[in-house]
């Protein structure tokens, strides 16, 4: 294969960093042979899928392993292949080449395909330069390293044109002339985050969830044998009404498309949009999009809708959250708890024990930040609960969910993290779905995570509290 100019593609220290990841074995061990649980019934209009489901097994197409879980990428490919007229996608990150190839095929067959990305993840491999990565933080630098390794099929530390054409999702889209833009299309340097993860097909179907279209969010980290992907959910929803609502959100961000006027609207440039009902047979579905300006009533925001829905609980509340840092939601949960409603919460280990985590509030704890400051609005629960903690995850994997199950009847799910930034800055979505069949799927996922979770004041958390309090002289 012809090689690109070495000065362009031999990326110095960046390439050396790949050595930390090691080579990719052509064969990993299989940890799954048969499902351990029977599949739950699916609603005919709302199907729920989970990449860690114990009720199914699939073959990871990139790492060549058999593993438990629903193949979220294949679910999306099947939806793409069903498209007859149009596919509109808004997703923060997109690096999976099989998905890109499916879109390229539909584009070639006359289906209109349009893609919106977050600007930090919208540059194809062929246009990247070494200094593109020197300014990244450790998290994004590791992502860049893994993507480079993923595209470098023969693992020689150099990317060939053929490797890029086969493996780089954005290059595949560009070669197929799939139009795309990012959140700089409004003339700005980008919104807070274009954090959506949705697809609208033929004005009739919405595919939406918490997963980015990446190895880490769908299948697992490339260089970590034990990784099975960040825990995520995906919904396939058949509803022209819902598709129209998501289509309107897409249209605001798309404007007149690439190369046109800077008339795209992202972030707070979009008009205020209250929660609205969508018609889905057999369900009551509300949908709302972020952000909401801090100058508007908090109750009218997505976080306000979350708090309102939690406040209706009478039996139980179960939370599986990547991050939970919005104080008013914690305050609402305290009120619910005081009515005797059991509450259980799991938060990603990377965020659960940070000074701003509402998980600490629920446990009645306070933790100073690195400046020895306490959040001015911090409100630890006077009567703590011990059913709050972190799931046990494989190395490299995260609890990326953003869902709550209320009374085994209601699910809240979407791209929206329970944070101030998601509420007031980012492009996000939240669905409130009242459907016991759908709720049962999310309840099963919660129980899977809760089964071996580390709850309450763990030794690790106690050590963290003691260390920080000593450093701060408290």
Labelled PLM ranges:
Residues 2-17:
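N-terminal Sec-pathway targeting helices
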Residues 17-29:
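Hydrophobic alpha-helical membrane-insertion segments, chiefly the h-region
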Residues 29-83, 93-311, 351-409, 416-431, ...:
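HKD-type phospholipase D/PLD-like phosphodiesterase module
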Residues 81-87, 111, 311-318, 339-343:
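Short, surface-exposed connector motifs at secondary-structure boundaries
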Residues 87-91, 181-182, 316-321, 345-346:
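Short catalytic-loop micro-motif centered on adjacent basic/acidic residues
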Residues 241-266, 273, 441-474:
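Cysteine/selenocysteine-centered motifs that mediate thiol-based redox chemistry or coordinate metal-sulfur cofactors
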Residues 290, 318, 404, 468-474:
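Low-complexity, Gly/Ser/Thr/Pro-rich intrinsically disordered linker/tail segments
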Residues 309-310, 319-333, 337, 347-352, ...:
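Extended non-catalytic domains of envelope/secretory-pathway proteins
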């Amino acid at each position: 294969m012809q090689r690109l100019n070495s000065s362009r593609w031999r990326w110095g220290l960046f390439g050396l960093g790949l050595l930390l990841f090691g080579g990719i074995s052509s064969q990993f061990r299989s940890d799954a042979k048969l499902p351990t649980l029977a599949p739950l019934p699916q609603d005919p209009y709302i199907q729920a899928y989970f990449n860690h489901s114990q009720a199914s097994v699939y073959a990871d197409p990139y790492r060549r392993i058999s593993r438990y879980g629903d193949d979220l990428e294949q679910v999306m490919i099947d939806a793409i292949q069903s498209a007859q007229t149009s596919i509109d996608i808004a997703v923060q990150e997109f690096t999976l080449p099989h998905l890109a190839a499916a879109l390229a095929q539909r584009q070639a067959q006359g289906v209109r395909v349009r893609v919106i990305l977050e600007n930090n993840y919208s540059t194809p491999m062929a246009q990247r330069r070494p200094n593109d990565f020197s300014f990244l933080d450790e998290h994004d630098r590791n992502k860049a390293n893994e993507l480079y390794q993923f595209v470098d099929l023969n693992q020689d530390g150099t990317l060939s044109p053929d490797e890029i054409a086969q493996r780089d999702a954005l290059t595949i889209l560009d070669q197929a002339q799939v139009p795309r833009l990012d959140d700089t299309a409004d003339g700005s340097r980008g919104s807070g985050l274009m954090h959506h993860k949705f697809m609208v097909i033929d004005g009739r179907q919405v595919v939406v969830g918490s997963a980015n279209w990446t190895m880490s969010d769908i299948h697992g980290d490339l260089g970590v044998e034990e990784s099975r992907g960040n825990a995520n959910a995906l919904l396939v929803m058949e509803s022209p009404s819902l598709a129209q609502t998501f289509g309107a959100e897409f249209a605001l961000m798309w404007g007149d498309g690439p190369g046109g006027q800077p008339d795209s609207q992202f972030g707070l440039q979009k008009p205020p949009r209250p929660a609205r009902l969508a018609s889905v047979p057999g369900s009551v579905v509300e949908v709302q999009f972020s952000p909401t300006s801090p100058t508007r009533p908090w109750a009218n925001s997505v976080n306000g809708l979350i708090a309102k829905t939690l406040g209706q609980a009478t039996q139980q509340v179960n939370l599986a959250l990547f991050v939970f840092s919005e104080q008013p939601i914690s305050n609402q949960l305290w009120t619910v708890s005081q009515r005797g409603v059991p509450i259980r919460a799991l938060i990603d280990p990377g965020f659960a024990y940070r000074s701003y985590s509402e998980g600490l509030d629920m446990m009645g704890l306070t933790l100073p930040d690195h400046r020895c400051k306490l959040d001015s609005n911090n409100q630890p629960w006077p009567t703590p609960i011990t059913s709050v903690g972190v799931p046990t995850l494989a190395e490299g994997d995260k609890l990326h969910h953003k869902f709550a199950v209320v009374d085994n009847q209601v699910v809240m799910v979407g791209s929206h993290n329970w944070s101030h930034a998601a509420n007031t800055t980012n492009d996000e979505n939240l669905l409130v779905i009242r459907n016991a069949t759908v709720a049962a799927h999310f309840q099963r996922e919660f129980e899977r995570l809760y089964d071996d979770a580390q709850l309450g004041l763990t030794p690790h958390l106690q050590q963290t509290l003691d260390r920080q309090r000593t450093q701060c002289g408290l």
